[in-house]
UniProtKB/Swiss-Prot annotation:
Homotetramer. Pfam families: ICL. This is Isocitrate lyase. It comes from Aspergillus fumigatus (strain ATCC MYA-4609 / CBS 101355 / FGSC A1100 / Af293) (Neosartorya fumigata). Its EC number is 4.1.3.1, 4.1.3.30.
Amino acid sequence: MGFLEDEDQKYWDDVQAVKAWWKDSRWRYTKRPYTAEQIVAKRGNLKIHYPSNDQSKKLWKILESNFEKKVASFTYGCLEPTMLTQMAKYLDTVYVSGWQSSSTASSTDEPSPDLADYPMNTVPNKVNQLFMAQLFHDRKQREERITTPKDQRSKLPNIDYLRPIIADADTGHGGLTAVMKLTKLFIERGAAGIHIEDQAPGTKKCGHMAGKVLVPISEHINRLVAIRAQADIMGTDLLAIARTDSEAATLITSTIDHRDHAFIVGSTNPNLQPLNDLMLAGEQAGKTGEELQAIEDQWIAQAGLKLFDDAVVDTIKAGVHVNKDALIKEYLTAAKGKSNSEARAIAKGITGVDIYWDWDAPRTREGYYRYQGGTQCAINRAVAYAPFADLIWMESKLPDYAQAKEFADGVHAVWPEQKLAYNLSPSFNWKKAMPREEQETYIKRLGALGYAWQFITLAGLHTTALISDQFARAYAKQGMRAYGELVQEPEMEQGVDVVTHQKWSGANYVDNMLKMLTGGVSSTAAMGKGVTEDQFKH
């Protein structure tokens, strides 16, 4: 067999291996609009095993079990390795927040609010820092345990430091090739899963800010496909989480996808000029700031802005029809899921008139269409994303159980096996939202609805700020007493391993490596005679 035949045989062997991989139950709900042949053709000759693939498999196993049992894994945004090692004792996953990274860990070191305007390697870099710490502390612990006699080993901690990391991919930081490159970075740096949201990249906002602009459903599906394709090229089981910001969105970039049409807002006043024409005329007349805002406010007040379905319902109600309720039901049933042009034809057939409704007239100065979000809107998008996503997350304004149930029920009516995620956001005022008894059971109640993974995005930031404020305030007044009472004594009482920070940092582990290299003796061992950490021995 010649070189060309060998080359073809290897290619077809790889294709068959990919086809067999895709038959695994892991992919029973996953839709791929490409072939194994196309994926293998994009691979190089050197097969690389990515450690993150083991973590992805581990994460999937956790979430499969959670969904089956109707329980949840819950975690929070981790800032740095110290926090990571403490989380590993109690929580089975780790979250890496784009918000936290934007404010504390940009690769340019320039802090920013959560606008995803930091370089695209920022969050992957944070994942890498945490994953490297996981590997190190796992090695350190294993060395200590395996060199301890069996009869004493049970007294030692046995912490699973290798908790799967789920990270924030924002909107993908650009077009589809940018999404693929970002996905590649995350896989290389150790992420088990990533989430990506359906906002427009240039105007991305924190999920709890105003002014969110969506992309069409089809565009976000393309992003999800790009993530899966890149993971397939790299041979990994990376989890893709689809986030929708449509519950509170007010704008959308395009009307190209008919699945968005029912939620786009139009003007019902035929006597008005398009808003942008008036705004442009105002600018040319020298108006600025509040004067331009007044023009927009007046136009909106007169425009009769509403959804096309609402315009049809209002037309039927205002007409001379005898059976108005029946006609409304007939229209809404027939128009559900249809494009606007199809809905117009249905409406004319029922009402006998061409209803004036113009979605171009209210467009913003940036060209965006006005949009009316909400829970049903989010369900509409989630149902479309489900075949391409392992989990789905609806960003919401409040921790509202009834809304969470409405969303879960709406998605599961179409996709019963769809796993869901939930942001237990610190942007919510939890004290106002529900009593403490309900706070305590909220995660469990959501888990029963299928929210298999839940997370507090910024708990790492807030807990760090809280203890830093408490300690700095007390330290300024009480000096070292504050350190003893607020930090060291509680560390010792609660058995926090960082109290012996030299050992926590791996000094014993490194000493033993040096001794291995030098025949068992090292006069420069960091933990030798004279180390101050001996003060903490019992």
